Regions:
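Rossmann-fold NAD(P) dinucleotide-binding segment
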Residues: 54-66, 70-117
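Active-site-proximal catalytic alpha-helix in oxidoreductases
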Residues: 134-141, 162, 166-198, 207-221, ...
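Interdomain hinge/lid region at the active-site interface
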Residues: 171, 215-281
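Beta-strand segments within the central parallel beta-sheet cores of soluble alpha/beta enzyme folds
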Residues: 203-210, 262-266
Length: 293
């Protein structure tokens, strides 16, 4: 059975490795990215071409995949004059692997449906290294029939593919997960900063906290930076702040409010404003050690 032709937009660390995995598995691809070196690397492997526009990419593709930074970028690529919506084929499926605003995802899905195309939101867990080997965690959502249509491809990209229900549930779940994780990291980083300011040994604090129910991989990441000066949680303050902002917006769309998320976002934003945007989230420890009332 012939494999579907895939259009892939977004060749950052994660996207580039996802594309390499698809190429190794014999898929024909049409790709786009602002980074022409990344595009050239993909094309040099064979079985891939560069599309001149999102419209052209959609016209060539059975499945269109996004691995992009923000909802705003996704909307621009979908709705632009030479955008995906202008070229999408009837029966094609769009998959958004990024972390996007659920209401935006639902709107795009509705507009694609009017063209006879489907949509799956499928945000990712794990790292670019996992992407290269097809071992991602994929949180997929959308119409069940559409999901089953693309599941064979998702299974070649993910070790664990979760089906979460209607369109938007994947992005909702990812935002909840990131809200919980980043709030935990920010709180633990301040705990280690408080210990330093008070003259309490950070290693001893970790030994005590990690022997109880607060222990978690996130605590270890925070301890690695605050105590061992090793920054190994590969997620930037800028990205965390973006996701917290999306979570706050999602809660507003749901008719409620999260003061906890707003407080976490406020600390991340202040660290961002201080020039720490590209630092890994546990490095917010440095911001807390310098914070004055």
């Amino acid at each position: 059975m012939k494999k579907p032709t895939i259009g892939f937009i977004g060749l950052g660390l994660m996207g580039a490795n996802m594309v390499e995995n698809l190429q190794k598995r014999g898929y024909e691809l049409s790709v786009m990215d602002l980074n022409k070196d990344a595009v050239a690397t993909v094309i040099a492997r064979g079985n891939a071409t560069e599309a001149a526009s999102p419209k052209e990419l959609a016209e060539k593709s059975d499945i269109v995949m996004f691995c992009l930074t923000t909802s705003a970028v996704v909307e621009k690529i979908v709705y632009g004059e030479e955008g995906i919506l202008a070229g999408i084929k009837e029966g094609a499926v769009v998959i958004d692997f990024g972390t996007s605003i659920p209401e935006s995802t639902k709107k795009i899905g509705k507009d694609l449906a009017e063209k006879g195309a489907g949509m799956i939101d499928a945000p990712l867990g794990r790292t670019p290294a996992h992407a290269k080997d097809g071992l991602l965690n994929i949180m997929a959502a959308g119409d069940k029939e559409t999901f089953e249509k693309v599941k064979p491809v998702l299974d070649e990209q993910g070790e664990n593919v979760f089906y979460l229900g209607g369109l938007g549930a994947g992005h909702t779940t990812k935002l909840i997960n990131n809200f919980m994780g980043m709030t935990t990291v920010v709180a633990m980083s301040q705990a280690f900063a408080a210990a330093k300011l008070a003259g309490v040994d950070g290693q001893q604090l970790f030994d005590i906290m990690s022997s109880g129910p607060s222990n978690s991989p996130f605590m270890k990441f925070c301890k690695h930076y605050a105590v061992d000066n090793v920054s190994d949680l590969g997620f930037s303050i800028a990205n965390a702040n973006k996701d917290l902002g999306y979570f706050v917006q999602m809660m507003d769309d749901l008719g409620t409010v999260s003061d906890i998320a707003k407080a976490t976002s406020s600390n991340l934003q202040t660290a961002l404003d201080a020039g720490m945007g590209q630092a890994n989230v546990p490095e917010i420890f440095d911001y807390f050690t310098e914070l004055k009332k």
